[in-house]
């Protein structure tokens, strides 16, 4: 990560930050109350401020940084695939840690949304659910990955259970991909939503990896139902019981 200004006490722009709270003024008929609350939260989010200082494209970069600081699953020289990569924050973190370069790229991301090019990162603009996507990812990387990352979440519909089920499906598809392409000893990190259905996925991961952790990094908003499943040390088929 780039050198940054000294982090205030309390974390990334946390309790030690004296930045004044910004309020969004209400004008009749211009903005809904829910939208105003979201905008105020965004404007006053310490991770949003820090991402601008550090040059990361999203606050989500700090989720990956915090999880890696704890579990050390990203290391120099690894090959990485990032699913649902837009706008590129996780790719930026991975590129920095593994030392990927334009001459020898070792990070490949994919998203159906366009992503502004990043140094040392190959970005595929296509839906990961497309039949050709898995092979295109491997072709772009040139080998099996050491780590598969997935921060995918389905576009929200406003119906909580529907959103939950759609994102759970993406988790399962990402896991199937990871199990089919990871090197022996590789790692898999996936975003899931708390709700019960992730237990089936958890069972599958425990059968195929040495250890599996539930992780809620500090950068994940307290009110969010998201959590991350981190599966470490993939067992080759001959090792799976």
Curated annotation (Swiss-Prot):
The keyword Cytoplasm applies. It is found in: Cytoplasm. InterPro entries: RNA_methyltr_RlmE, RNA_MeTrfase_FtsJ_dom, rRNA-MeTfrase_E, SAM-dependent_MTases_sf. It catalyses: uridine(2552) in 23S rRNA + S-adenosyl-L-methionine = 2'-O-methyluridine(2552) in 23S rRNA + S-adenosyl-L-homocysteine + H(+). GO terms for cellular component: cytoplasm. Signal peptide: none annotated. The active site is at 191 (proton acceptor). Keywords: Cytoplasm, Methyltransferase, rRNA processing, S-adenosyl-L-methionine, Transferase. It is an enzyme of class 2 (transferase). S-adenosyl-L-methionine binds at residues 88, 90, 111, 127, 151. One of its GO terms (molecular function) is rRNA (uridine-2'-O-)-methyltransferase activity. Its EC number is 2.1.1.166. The keyword rRNA-binding does not apply. Specifically methylates the uridine in position 2552 of 23S rRNA at the 2'-O position of the ribose in the fully assembled 50S ribosomal subunit. HAMAP family: RNA_methyltr_E. Belongs to the class I-like SAM-binding methyltransferase superfamily. RNA methyltransferase RlmE family. PANTHER family: RIBOSOMAL RNA METHYLTRANSFERASE, RRNA METHYLTRANSFERASE 2, MITOCHONDRIAL. This is Ribosomal RNA large subunit methyltransferase E. It comes from Bartonella quintana (strain Toulouse) (Rochalimaea quintana).
